Amino acid sequence: MVLGRGSLCLRSLSALGATCARRGLGQALLGLSLCHSDFRKNLTVQQDIMKVELLPALTDNYMYLIIDEDTQEAAIVDPVQPQKVIEAAKKHHVKLTTVLTTHHHWDHAGGNEKLVKLEPGLKVYGGDDRIGALTHKVTHLSTLQVGSLSVKCLSTPCHTSGHICYFVSKPGSSEPSAVFTGDTLFVAGCGKFYEGTADEMYKALLEVLGRLPPDTKVYCGHEYTVNNLKFARHVEPGNAAIQEKLAWAKEKYAIGEPTVPSTLAEEFTYNPFMRVKEKTVQQHAGETDPVTTMRAIRREKDQFKVPRD
């Protein structure tokens, strides 16, 4: 959750949203939360291999329109607000062919069924039978194409048992790729362990995502950056990278701009959940093993009271 305008209301909405997502009660949240995305700006990230349009949704979610400029074909990640997706595709004059769903929680998959009615013939990918309108179930290292772009599916169970991250690259290109991480990896944070263990999150972050090229751009599912960095500062108060990123993120939020994307290389400098091998993080947790450190700091984060500064 982000701090700032209407923060008391947003705390309540975020808590409600998490509950609705776990219980499949997305419609209960719909009327309450659409308004906040109007205060957050869209952003188009021009990568040499693709264009990515960041589409704010609900209180703090992101949807991502991935555009292959060679073919003008596009995919959408987690289209919880279908009408916004349709409008973005029209703006860019692209053909929407593919839905990439990271996990079944309503604030990510809740728009699938409406979108496929608005755009018949869409291919809907995901790793969990609980995902609405699913047409193609994928597993770890499954691959698919969006125009000339290659999409590799990475199984990262923990937040949910069927969570998939999507690594998008262009064959033969030396330019940075992108990974769409849903609720597994956030800027300076990770998702709650609703259906998994610390060992699974360790494998997801360090052994799956952490082994991608360091310059890979990370597009996560929520704008949680300021709060995540305040917890990171609590864990490592002497880490200059955290202090610098927090100051930058506060400035971005103040003007309604996204703090996404980061890169994997950056995450290893300030994300405590990516830094569980570091002595400073282990000492804070009172542990000497990366997995038990992961478990300890996740439990602490779940109870962390975010300072107002």
Swiss-Prot record:
InterPro entries: Clx_II_MBL, HAGH_C, Hydroxyacylglutathione_Hdrlase, Metallo-B-lactamas, RibonucZ/Hydroxyglut_hydro
One cellular-component annotation, GO: mitochondrial matrix
Catalytic activity: an S-(2-hydroxyacyl)glutathione + H2O = a 2-hydroxy carboxylate + glutathione + H(+); (R)-S-lactoylglutathione + H2O = (R)-lactate + glutathione + H(+)
Residues binding Zn(2+) 2, per UniProt: 107-108, 183, 222
Chain positions with N6-acetyllysine modification: 90, 117, 230
Residues that bind Zn(2+) 1: 103, 105, 159, 183
Names of the cofactor(s): Zn(2+)
Enzyme Commission (EC) number: 3.1.2.6
Pathway listed: Secondary metabolite metabolism; methylglyoxal degradation; (R)-lactate from methylglyoxal: step 2/2
Assembly and interaction partners: Monomer.
NCBIfam families found in the cross-reference section: GSH_gloB (TIGR03413)
Function: Thiolesterase that catalyzes the hydrolysis of S-D-lactoyl-glutathione to form glutathione and D-lactic acid.
Family: Belongs to the metallo-beta-lactamase superfamily. Glyoxalase II family.
Name of the protein: Hydroxyacylglutathione hydrolase, mitochondrial
Organism whose genome encodes this protein: Mus musculus (Mouse)
Gene it is expressed from: Hagh
